Amino acid sequence: MCIRDRLNTPNSLAVCVDNSRQDIPPISGDFTFFGGIYRDVWLTAVSKQHFHLTNYGSEGIFISTPKVSEEKGTILIRGDIKNDATQKALLELEHIIYHPNGSIAQSLKQSIQIKAGEQYSFRSETSPILSPQLWTPETPHLYRVESILRDKKTKTVLDQSNHYTGFRWFSFDGERGFSLNGKPYKLRGICRHQDQKPIGVALTDEMHRRDIKLMKEMGANFIRISHYPQDDALLEMCDKLGMLAWEEIPIIDIVPDTPGYTENCERNLREMIRQHYNHPSIITWGYMNEILLVTQRLYKKEEELKPILERTLALANRLEVVLKEEDTTRVSTMAFHGSNSYNEVGLGSITDIVGWNLYQGWYGGNLTGFEQYLEEQHKKYPSHPMIVSEYGAGSDKRLHSLQPHAFDFSIEYQQKYLEHYLPVLEETSYICGGTHWNFIDFSSALRDESMPRINNKGLVYSNRTPKDIYYYYKAAWRQDIPVLHIASRDWTHRSGIQHGKEPVILPVKIYTNLPEVELFIDGKSLGKQKTKNFAVTFEVPFCQKEHFIAAKAENRKAVQDISFVEDGIRLNFTPIPANLNGSNLRDLELAINVGSYCFYTSDESNLTWLPDQPYTENGWGYIGGESKSSQIQIKNTNDGPLFQTLRNGIEGYRFDVPNGVYEIEFLFTDIFRENATTVYQLGRNSDVENRENRFDIIINDQTIEESFSSCRESDYFHALRKRYNITNFRNKIEIRFSVRNGKSFLNGIKLRKLY
């Protein structure tokens, strides 16, 4: 809009935004859609003759390197100049190319005449620059292109623009994978959402730059900018620090039959490409993510599904044409969820490369299903290059397990999952690479699970503190430096069952790229172990409230001499006696995560709830029942995971304890009601059935609750805690659940001796 009439007077500029329109992507997705204008806003003043700034939001200058080799390379500069004056203009356009060291490589100059109100397109290519310094993630050499527009007569500078470019070439091959500058190169990548608690997506430029620095520190060389174009500051750091990039527009889940949707998708694609065309880090443009996921789950009948598939195929073909019109120097891609239907309907053959979002061993199946699926795809489509565009498992630092399994959200299962996936990606030559989902624990408004509204598959927390698993990747990917990390920062408060005065043996894992590690507890050596898959696990004896754990490894990466690398951490430990009858229970608070194999440490109280166990004489445990779980959010508590697991059909619970007065606390949440599940759980639904549950609670033959109903006292999916003081004269506390309707259940139990 023209504001000349408003110059030299005070003005207010207001912008009203609305993201509710259904003809603008994204219309759905497994991430929170924050609103508002959250990127930088610039008010740009220009001369009457200037570079074209209204070309889909670009800067009006497009730079590429059409001819590149180790011996020589050329730079192509094209763009448009506008003359907004009422008379013709005689101009001079100069392009100066600077070497990475700042010296001038070449200068191009031309004279231009533009009629009043018209636009001029220019195109200039340098003569060959000999022995160019190639751009790679390890050596991100950048050449600067300075474009200067002057008045031909007065030499007055009318407009000026600076852009970086890099000399590199690349290829994707179905058998050989990815190559950069003529050499095989594994894409070691991360997907990145952009939010951060508590500011949503309104990150500062410094925050965007910090994220790329963290990825580079880990050893990543590739980023999938998912699922939407992100801040210029991010791509600037990709160029400068060396991070290959995949950028995409947010066409997700389903293609609606909405007027204008196709046109807006096309516009989104042109905007992304033109705005970010000059970044040498970008190697691929994407335009669809899991586009059949919602489609196939919502529409089962062929007459409903067929027109949607036809729309989807038509849009993909149209966008592929647009992409190649805009940029022939990069490749196209789409990301598919793990279903061969993409190939069956024809989507798999449209783009240059295919991305697969695979979660075998998390949402379903087992871990080895990952490599089996990839092998099947490669056998069927051997010429089609593949990237594993998503893989990951959730983790909650409050949850830990010595028997980790899928969807328990323990830190240990995420580690187990990724320790399986990464070697497959690294060792399979036809896989171009992978991008872990996700770099951060990000906001997802539709998710419940252990951390409601959060998808917790990140390698770092929302505040960007690295999880222990971050250092597994660092050990695997950073072969230029020694890495040694005791992987217990996410588990500093430990507990375990102690038999007599014997220490409790618990695993301590170390991530390292050094061949051998020695571990110490309170200064005493536990010996040395060889590294396997960048990890070493020691069985460590815990017996007191605090231990200092230290790891030491010989660093043979040093060129001049051999040195040692060390890491240390303090761990808190609470022993729980196996024989309660023979112990002093005065200071004991025995808390049990009923129905779960996980330790749970409350981040509010630091109290650790132990995994459940069957009753044994002189000890404690459940009698009867089976484990059940739900991923629905539990209200009225911040300790949701404690209430998402339970023992269903439990007959009783028993503690063999000395006589005295005890406080018993029961945790209940009735999860036995149908509730909505999100399609993004990829078919992993709760296994509970609808029913009303009522039962009596009996302690040492005394009925303390008749026809108890958790849902009547606190509603379904609401946390309920009930405490009772019991005088024990029997050297045992025996709890029985007598069913009146449905089944009995228990989510948690806590015992504390008062007197």
Range-by-range predicted roles:
Residues 4-225, 237, 242-245, 268, ...:
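Secreted/periplasmic carbohydrate-active enzymes, especially glycoside hydrolases
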Residues 18, 166-171, 190-194, 224-237, ...:
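Short, solvent-exposed turn/loop segments enriched in Gly/Ser/Thr/Pro and often Arg
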Residues 33-36, 43, 49, 281-286, ...:
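Substrate-binding clefts and catalytic carboxylate motifs of secreted carbohydrate-active enzymes
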Residues 172-176, 230-235, 266-275, 334-345, ...:
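Alpha-helical scaffolding within the catalytic cores
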Residues 185, 239-241, 272-280, 345-348, ...:
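Acidic (Asp/Glu)-rich catalytic clusters
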Residues 223-231, 254-263, 339-342, 361-372:
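Acidic-and-aromatic substrate-binding clefts and catalytic sites of carbohydrate-active enzymes
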Residues 297-309, 676-687:
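Intrinsically disordered, low-complexity Ser/Thr- and acidic-rich flexible linkers and loops
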Residues 568-755:
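Compositionally biased, intrinsically disordered or flexible polar/acidic segments
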